[in-house]
Amino acid sequence: MTIESTNSFVVPSDTKLIDVTPLGSTKLFQPIKVGNNVLPQRIAYVPTTRFRASKDHIPSDLQLNYYNARSQYPGTLIITEATFASERGGIDLHVPGIYNDAQAKSWKKINEAIHGNGSFSSVQLWYLGRVANAKDLKDSGLPLIAPSAVYWDENSEKLAKEAGNELRALTEEEIDHIVEVEYPNAAKHALEAGFDYVEIHGAHGYLLDQFLNLASNKRTDKYGCGSIENRARLLLRVVDKLIEVVGANRLALRLSPWASFQGMEIEGEEIHSYILQQLQQRADNGQQLAYISLVEPRVTGIYDVSLKDQQGRSNEFAYKIWKGNFIRAGNYTYDAPEFKTLINDLKNDRSIIGFSRFFTSNPDLVEKLKLGKPLNYYNREEFYKYYNYGYNSYDESEKQVIGKPLA
């Protein structure tokens, strides 16, 4: 397998540039221990869905080149992308999975490249729930499932009914299967693939977050009834089960307290304080997670939030409860070139800063931040295409190139 040189990524000449003040002398480039590993700097690539796997969910040669390029600076933590934990968890074309041997073998080749660069890897386990594609699931004989039969918008209801795959609530037996079989199977394959960490996606309106949120959880059993303890029960069960599988020091969790993405209501401090208290109790008993990835209130899903709408929202409550590491992510470039917010947030010695959108257009982002080189602005129009154009290359011929499975 040939891996492309990082020098082959040339953006269009009219790409907007963002000026950067050199950050090499800041805490951003000081080491931090994450689980059993010491990262020599505090920059993480946080997950970006890009649809470049093969159509049957096997990581591709395009992804190998992509992650190799973004792990070139030693010690970078690469959290690959949202990755299906099971077939029932989602079946969108060209999204990678980590639930079978072929997928694990392909991810292993990507991890070998990341580790060969002296960097680290984490996989984000994804379960879509009510925002999955009803027709694609129907075509594979799979149900559209959620905490409750509450669609996230009118169009999703229309499409589900047209597909003959209407949304229904998970049974308690199905929930047990998700906890005891589906997530552990994905986590075991992640270990076989060589990932350093396994991150549970508990944010942005996907299945585990749907249980947390009153807009999507109308259950009347032990997973609902409006109580915080019940709504957080599934998430904490998944955490506890995966601690058994991968070990706490290799396990992580992503949360988005202020997101209102995909029909969700803002959850805020209350339920997330409870979750963090529960995780801290586990840490106090020797089961501390590697990190918690927390989305800043500057972002909700794929959208930036105005300064006006951010008022009264802060993640400071979380840093007072959880004493372990945080990955803090969400539009840290908004005050470039000075990056005052980033520098201030690093005063908390347990913080790593996550970037995603600007990593898509700057494979050498870490070096640019260190040396103060301008950043290429990202091209959102090419985020969710299947071809290589806008991913590893801006050569027009790459619009004909689709990823080939690595295994």
Curated annotation (Swiss-Prot):
- Catalyses which reaction? A + NADPH + H(+) = AH2 + NADP(+)
Write down the superkingdom of origin: Eukaryota
Q: Name one GO molecular function term.
A: estrogen binding
| Swiss-Prot/TrEMBL keywords | Flavoprotein, FMN, NADP, Oxidoreductase
Task: Note the SUPFAM superfamilies from the entry.
Answer: FMN-linked oxidoreductases (SSF51395)
Q: Site May interact with the steroid: list residues.
A: C225
Q: Which cofactor does it need?
A: FMN
This protein's record includes keyword Nucleotide-binding: no
Keyword Oxidoreductase attached: yes
**Where do the catalytic residues lie?**
Y206
List positions binding substrate: H201, G202, A203, H204
Q: Where does FMN bind?
A: T49, Q124, R254, R357
Its Enzyme Commission number?
A: 1.6.99.1
Q: Which Gene3D superfamilies match?
A: Aldolase class I (3.20.20.70)
Return the InterPro entries for the record: Aldolase_TIM, OxRdtase_FMN_N, Oye-like
Q: What class of enzyme is it?
A: oxidoreductase
Family per record: Belongs to the NADH:flavin oxidoreductase/NADH oxidase family.
Q: Its function?
A: Oxidoreductase that binds mammalian estrogens with high affinity.
This chain belongs to which protein, by name? Probable NADPH dehydrogenase
Instruction: Look up and give the organism this protein is from.
Output: Candida albicans
